[in-house]
């Protein structure tokens, strides 16, 4: 049985080694529905993993974008947002952000500025989607003008975790934005440069090894 588990882990690692992988983080006040939105999107196929070390919940998802298999890590705050701040590791190498507020609670909208400022401190260029959740409680909210989105040129999605309105579109669009960002961002360039550096090191090692063998062949035999 242990061997089977090890093999399963190896297969999972192979998946991550051979496919694209993106990280999408969720921000917003407590109880705005971040976790419920993810669970609604993933439905019965999700297996959230509690990572107590980082005070977060990790949701894994496999998507297809332009014919490519994309492995998506959705990071949820797991209550850490109560402190109105997230640890820097939460933002590390994120490729997109979903920022949520509750249309029924004005304070969650007011606090968007704090969340957005912190996001831009750590990830100044990643795409960010603004999400107005719980519209099922008052559909008239979709007619309101939420100026925060316009002020920062953010796409605004009106959604409901309760009845599923626009949830699938929200997450599919977030995945596409994350993939597009990764392919064109400095993160991607850093990966390319690192691969080139590794290739140069391998070539240097091969050349050094070849030179040593050549020197050994040319060395005269002792008289």
UniProtKB/Swiss-Prot annotation:
Gene coding for it: Rabl2
The protein's assembly and partners: Interacts with IFT27, IFT81, IFT172, ATP6V1E1, HK1, LDHC, MAPRE1 and HSPA2.
InterPro entries listed in its UniProt record: P-loop_NTPase, RabL2, Small_GTP-bd, Small_GTPase
Record has Iron as a keyword: no
Binding sites annotated in the UniProt record for GTP: 28-35, 76-80, 133-136
Keyword vocabulary terms for this entry: Ciliopathy, GTP-binding, Nucleotide-binding
Biased composition (Polar residues): 210-223
Phenotype caused by lack of the gene: Exhibits phenotypes characteristic of ciliopathies. Pre-axial polydactyly. Retinal degeneration, characterized by loss of the outer nuclear layer that contains the cell body of photoreceptor cells.
GO cellular component labels: intraciliary transport particle B; sperm midpiece
GO molecular function: GTP binding; GTPase activity
A Gene Ontology BP annotation from the UniProt entry: photoreceptor cell morphogenesis
SMART domains recorded: RAB, RAN, RAS, RHO
Signal sequence residues: none
Function of the molecule: Plays an essential role in male fertility, sperm intra-flagellar transport, and tail assembly. Binds, in a GTP-regulated manner, to a specific set of effector proteins including key proteins involved in cilia development and function and delivers them into the growing sperm tail.
Residue ranges of the region described as Disordered: 200-223
Family: Belongs to the small GTPase superfamily. Rab family.
Organism annotation: Mus musculus (Mouse)
Tissue distribution of the protein: Isoform 2 is expressed in the testis and localizes to the mid-piece of the sperm tail (at protein level). Isoform 2 is expressed at higher levels in testis than isoform 1. Isoform 1 and isoform 2 are widely expressed and notably within other tissues containing motile cilia including the lung, trachea, brain, ovary and kidney.
Protein name: Rab-like protein 2A
Xref: CDD domains: RabL2
